[in-house]
Amino acid sequence: KPCCSIHDSSCCGI
């Protein structure tokens, strides 16, 4: 699944 998801928003690095 892509990064920046509702579950992995922190993996985006924002």
Swiss-Prot record:
Modified residues (Isoleucine amide): I14
Entry's localization field: Secreted
UniProt modification remark: Contains 2 disulfide bonds. Contains 2 disulfide bonds that can be either 'C1-C3, C2-C4' or 'C1-C4, C2-C3', since these disulfide connectivities have been observed for conotoxins with cysteine framework V (for examples, see AC P0DQQ7 and AC P81755)..
Keyword annotations: Amidation, Disulfide bond, Secreted, Toxin
Secreted among keywords: yes
Tissues expressed in: Expressed by the venom duct.
Name used for this protein in its record: Conotoxin tx5b
Transmembrane segments: none
MF terms in GO: toxin activity
GO CC terms in record: extracellular region
Disulfide bonds: none
Family: Belongs to the conotoxin T superfamily.
Record remark on domains: The cysteine framework is V (CC-CC).
Miscellaneous comment: Negative results: does not have the ability to interact with the G-protein coupled somatostatin type 3 receptor (SSTR3).
Entry keyword annotation includes Disulfide bond: yes
Signal peptide: none
